[in-house]
Amino acid sequence: EIPGELKKKEKIIAEAYLKVNKHLSTVVKKSDIHTGQFRTRKVTILAGKKTKETIHHENGIELKLHLERTYFSARSGSERLRIAKLVKPGEEVLVMFSGAAPYPLVIAKNSEARHVYGIELNPEAHTYAMENVLLNNLQDRVTIVHGDVKHKIPPLKKKFDRVVMPLPKTGEQFLDLALLKAKKGASIHLYSFLDETEIDPYAKKVKEICKKLGSPVKVLDKVKCGQFSPGTFR
C-alpha cells in the first residue's frame, strides 16, 4: 500500500523494497475494491517476477494461492491462530467459506482437532485448497469440499464441536446451516464488518435470529480482529 502522494514513485519504491527483502520475488499493488461473487480483487505487478501466484507463510503453514482469483487476507493471520488455540483436543471443526484453506490448515496445524472440514464455492480457491492440504501434509486431518454450503451442509451426517464462518459480510444469513450441524454446546465463530456502535446491536440481532431458528445461543465474546476502515472493525 503506497500513499497517493507517492504514486508516481511506486515502481521505484517497489524495486527498493525487493532489494531490501531478499526473500521476496514480486511486489504488487492491490486494488481497494473487492468485486464479484467471490470477493476477489485486481493487483498490479510493480517489480520482480511477472506472476500473481504466491506462497504465503503463516502460523506454521504454507498457503499457495493466486492473488486475483482467490479471496485472502493476510491480516487475519492472528485471528486464525486465535481460533486454533481455542480448539480442544478431539474437536471436529467445520469451516464454511474456507477459500484456499487458511483456516482449516492453521487450525489443524496448531491444535489437536480430530478433523477439520472446509467448504468452498469458488472452484479456483478449492483447487488451491486441495493442493495446500497436500503441501502441508495434512490430508489425514483436513477434508475440503467444493460447493455451495446451502447444498453441501444439510446432507452431512456428522455434527461439529466448532463452526467457523469467515465470511466478512452477510454471515448471519447462514446461521441456520451452522446451527443445523452444531453439536449441543458447540462454539460458532461469526464475522462481520461493524462500526463501534453497531457491535452490541448486532450481537442482539444474532441472538434473535438463532432464537427464531429454535436454537437459543449465548454470546460468549465479541472480539475486534481487524480494522476495515477508520471506526469500522471486523
Could you describe each region identified by the protein language model?
Residues E1-R234:
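SAM-dependent transferase fold signal centered on methyltransferase-like domains
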